[in-house]
Amino acid sequence: MAHLTLSIRGLLLALMSVLLISVAQLSMKWGMGTLNQLWSDLVMLWQGEDYSSLFSQALAPVMAVGAGLFCYALSMACWVMALKRLPLSIAYPLLSLSYVLVYLGAVYLPWLNEPLSWVKGTGIFLILLGLIFVLPKKNQTSDKS
């Protein structure tokens, strides 16, 4: 198997995959949470209640879930292309950035509004620190160990 070198295009594809999967997680979290709140209304729909108001309430969360699934598919396509261009030892640790992005999104997006905690913040710091240790430095061409 040919030796894979660090490629800017591969890094960009991997980072795009991370961004898309983070957007997918946040979209689906909001969409499914909102649909869950509408569950009793959805049951009434099956019993012949007013369709138009329920449809207007459920449209945005259903679209958010659909957009999340679409982002998952795009993320997978980017990931497959990134794996063709990057060594797995470089590509795979980049996936941990999605934990960072999803946590920050869950905390700072007002419609998710999850609590900020120092324990989780420490975990995020450790993930980022781990990436610094694992990813090669600019002047490092190959791992001699």
From Swiss-Prot:
Molecular function terms, GO-annotated: carbohydrate derivative transmembrane transporter activity
Q: Where are the transmembrane segments?
A: 4-24, 62-82, 90-110, 115-135
User: What biological process terms from GO does the record include?
Assistant: lipid A biosynthetic process; lipopolysaccharide biosynthetic process
Which regions of this chain are Cytoplasmic-facing, per the record's topological domains?
1-3, 83-89, 136-145
Which stretches are Periplasmic in the membrane topology? 25-61, 111-114
> Per UniProt, what is the membrane topology?
Multi-pass membrane protein
- State the pathway, as annotated in the record: Bacterial outer membrane biogenesis; lipopolysaccharide biosynthesis
- Any S-S bridges, and between which cysteines? none
The record's principal subcellular location, in a coarse class, is: membrane
Q: Which GO terms describe its cellular component?
A: plasma membrane
| Keywords associated with the record | Cell inner membrane, Cell membrane, Lipid A biosynthesis, Lipid biosynthesis, Lipid metabolism, Lipopolysaccharide biosynthesis, Membrane, Transmembrane, Transmembrane helix, Transport
Subcellular localization: Cell inner membrane
Domain of life according to the entry: Bacteria
Query: Which family, according to UniProt?
Result: Belongs to the ArnF family.
Q: Give the quaternary structure.
A: Heterodimer of ArnE and ArnF.
This chain's function reads:
Translocates 4-amino-4-deoxy-L-arabinose-phosphoundecaprenol (alpha-L-Ara4N-phosphoundecaprenol) from the cytoplasmic to the periplasmic side of the inner membrane.
Q: What is this protein called?
A: Probable 4-amino-4-deoxy-L-arabinose-phosphoundecaprenol flippase subunit ArnF
Q: Which organism is it from?
A: Shewanella sediminis (strain HAW-EB3)
